[in-house]
Amino acid sequence: MGQKTNPIGNRLGIIRGWDSNWYGGNDYGDKIAEDYKIRKYIHARLSKASVSKVIIERTLKLVTVTITTARPGIIIGKGGQEVDKLKEELKKVTDKEVQINIFEIKRPELDAFLVATSICRQIESRISYRRAIKMAIAASMRMNAEGIKVLISGRLNGAEMARSEGFKEGRVPLSTFRADIDYALAEAHTTYGRMGIKVWIMKGEVYGKRDLSPLAGMDKKQAGQGGGKGGDSPRGDRKPFNKGGKPDARKRK
């Protein structure tokens, strides 16, 4: 079942926490819809800021929105002007006081959502999907990821029939609950239609008790940009795999 389920939802309450933390009474449905609007608005408004997670916490009169990003300087702006504007805009959505916290992602190469969106942008810029995926895999492995798997589906290279093609390096044990696996899905909009990109990144294994907060281990930042360098790590063999379509050309030789 680990191959079929969402790796994040499958580990909730074990090694992962929830991205929405509040008590819902009779207006539970309204709060769910409001959370969706907040996340959709932030991702659209801050599309150039490399936003990954939007974590929402609620009290009776306050909504706390925590944004994890690789480029906090874009969100904060000069003297905090941009974050103040965002706060006022979110007040109109929630009709409550809004507090915004910003956390920096120091190694965006290990964030599945940022890796998936980066691949999408390159495909939309007409870069070969194989080149974009292999570069993303190499960057993640350089940052000491234990494994990464990427699956792309759609009309690859403009083919008439849609198919799926995958790339894998290292180990990604989806059935091991203690495995810290990040997962994301993103879509690339091309002239041939939409392409779906799924990314799984294995960061390591968790032993013993762990803080289930979604922000466990992250540092709060006021400004600056994400990034950082990591040492080289031993890699497994890269294993391309196909689902449907033509078999791998290397196998026909």
Swiss-Prot record:
<dbReference type="InterPro" id="IPR036419">
    <property type="entry name" value="Ribosomal_S3_C_sf"/>
</dbReference>
<dbReference type="InterPro" id="IPR001351">
    <property type="entry name" value="Ribosomal_uS3_C"/>
</dbReference>
<dbReference type="GO" id="GO:0003729">
    <property type="term" value="F:mRNA binding"/>
</dbReference>
<feature type="compositionally biased region" description="Basic and acidic residues">
    <location>
        <begin position="232"/>
        <end position="253"/>
    </location>
</feature>
<dbReference type="InterPro" id="IPR005704">
    <property type="entry name" value="Ribosomal_uS3_bac-typ"/>
</dbReference>
<keyword id="KW-0699">rRNA-binding</keyword>
<dbReference type="InterPro" id="IPR004044">
    <property type="entry name" value="KH_dom_type_2"/>
</dbReference>
<dbReference type="InterPro" id="IPR009019">
    <property type="entry name" value="KH_sf_prok-type"/>
</dbReference>
<comment type="function">
    <text>Binds the lower part of the 30S subunit head. Binds mRNA in the 70S ribosome, positioning it for translation.</text>
</comment>
<keyword id="KW-0689">Ribosomal protein</keyword>
<dbReference type="Pfam" id="PF07650">
    <property type="entry name" value="KH_2"/>
</dbReference>
<feature type="domain" description="KH type-2">
    <location>
        <begin position="38"/>
        <end position="106"/>
    </location>
</feature>
<dbReference type="InterPro" id="IPR015946">
    <property type="entry name" value="KH_dom-like_a/b"/>
</dbReference>
<keyword id="KW-0694">RNA-binding</keyword>
<protein>
    <recommendedName>
        <fullName>Small ribosomal subunit protein uS3</fullName>
    </recommendedName>
</protein>
<dbReference type="GO" id="GO:0022627">
    <property type="term" value="C:cytosolic small ribosomal subunit"/>
</dbReference>
<dbReference type="InterPro" id="IPR004087">
    <property type="entry name" value="KH_dom"/>
</dbReference>
<dbReference type="GO" id="GO:0003735">
    <property type="term" value="F:structural constituent of ribosome"/>
</dbReference>
<dbReference type="GO" id="GO:0019843">
    <property type="term" value="F:rRNA binding"/>
</dbReference>
<dbReference type="GO" id="GO:0006412">
    <property type="term" value="P:translation"/>
</dbReference>
<dbReference type="InterPro" id="IPR018280">
    <property type="entry name" value="Ribosomal_uS3_CS"/>
</dbReference>
<comment type="similarity">
    <text>Belongs to the universal ribosomal protein uS3 family.</text>
</comment>
<keyword id="KW-0687">Ribonucleoprotein</keyword>
<dbReference type="Pfam" id="PF00189">
    <property type="entry name" value="Ribosomal_S3_C"/>
</dbReference>
<feature type="region of interest" description="Disordered">
    <location>
        <begin position="216"/>
        <end position="253"/>
    </location>
</feature>
<comment type="subunit">
    <text>Part of the 30S ribosomal subunit. Forms a tight complex with proteins S10 and S14.</text>
</comment>
